[in-house]
């Protein structure tokens, strides 16, 4: 199983276009030990030619240009993208679909009923794409409750089994499900390659660690999970907003019950954080917070990172 990190930043990327926080300002001035990040998305493959995308960020065109493997060049119009799995309906995870409108056939998009509802009403991307390539929607089935959904395969991606996992996070501000949780608003994905018997749990939007989530985290070979904020009040400390991390659907890394303490007892998985907000001090590779992560055996994803399982 091959995983390529197309983008590792949270909404707005890093530096964010209108932000002059401690991180963004220093990066622009060139006195920051760290790198820019586009908005989060990953691609997975088992053969290096055919790929499934997980989320489609607004930065997708640049991300694809920096990833030659996804353009095999077999015909005048070609792509290695065989399908797109949406984990939620957030703007920074879905608007990249519009950049793929020149596709010569319908986009095969896999998402839950809740996400489909948002993308045909409040943020009607699917409706817009009806006038271009159109969308072939593949519903992801989730039972009511906390159990993972039905496993599935993306057509054209041989040997990769995907299982949707309901997560407690937050629907986007435009959604009627904002602060009104419905199963399927946000999912994680369990990726498994039967040939290698390796697995990865991908959850860039993770607000709570429920029992069924922890169970998967304990047995995964690799965790690629929410690293948005360092502290619960990070945005308030930066003078940006009074919204808390968990209010926005993200479990912070530090503090009691934070991601670091959750990951501490897990000795087997490769632990990687993704979806890093521009305000997070871990972006600074010389920061005390980054050193704390490294001491805990936790890595930080970067654009262009490859994970081979």
From Swiss-Prot:
It comes from the Bacteria. It holds the Pfam family Lactamase_B_2. GO terms for biological process: pyrroloquinoline quinone biosynthetic process. Keywords: PQQ biosynthesis, Transport. Pathway: Cofactor biosynthesis; pyrroloquinoline quinone biosynthesis. The keyword Metal-binding does not apply. PANTHER family: COENZYME PQQ SYNTHESIS PROTEIN B, HYDROLASE C777.06C-RELATED-RELATED. May be involved in the transport of PQQ or its precursor to the periplasm. NCBIfam families: PQQ_syn_pqqB. Belongs to the PqqB family. This is Coenzyme PQQ synthesis protein B.
């Amino acid at each position: 199983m091959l995983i390529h990190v197309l983008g590792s930043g949270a909404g707005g990327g890093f530096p964010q276009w209108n932000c002059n926080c401690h991180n963004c300002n220093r990066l622009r001035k060139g006195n920051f030990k760290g790198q820019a990040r586009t908005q989060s998305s990953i691609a997975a493959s088992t053969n290096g030619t055919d790929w499934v995308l997980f989320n489609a960020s607004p930065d997708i065109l640049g991300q694809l240009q920096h990833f030659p493997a996804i353009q095999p060049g077999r015909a005048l119009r070609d792509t290695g993208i065989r399908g797109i799995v949406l984990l939620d309906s957030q703007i920074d995870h879905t608007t990249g679909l519009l950049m793929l409108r020149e596709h010569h056939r319908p986009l095969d998009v896999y998402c839950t009923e809740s996400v489909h509802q948002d993308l045909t009403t409040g943020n009607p991307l699917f409706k817009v794409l009806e006038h271009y390539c159109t969308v072939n929607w593949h519903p992801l089935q989730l039972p009511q409750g906390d159990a993972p959904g039905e496993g599935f395969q993306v057509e054209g991606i041989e040997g990769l089994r995907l299982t949707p996992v309901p997560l407690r996070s937050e629907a986007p501000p435009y959604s009627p499900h904002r602060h009104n949780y419905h199963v399927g608003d946000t999912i994680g994905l369990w990726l498994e390659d039967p040939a290698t018997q390796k697995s990865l749990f991908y959850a860039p939007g993770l607000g709570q660690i429920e029992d069924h989530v922890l169970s998967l985290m304990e047995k995964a070979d690799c965790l690629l999970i929410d690293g948005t904020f360092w502290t619960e009040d990070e945005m308030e400390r930066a003078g940006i907003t009074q919204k808390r991390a968990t209010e926005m659907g993200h479990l912070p890394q530090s503090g009691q019950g934070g991601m670091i303490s959750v990951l501490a007892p897990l000795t087997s998985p490769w632990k990687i954080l993704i979806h890093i907000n521009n305000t997070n001090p871990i972006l600074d590779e010389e920061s005390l917070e980054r050193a704390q992560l490294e001491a805990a055996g936790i890595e930080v994803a970067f654009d262009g990172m490859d994970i081979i399982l």
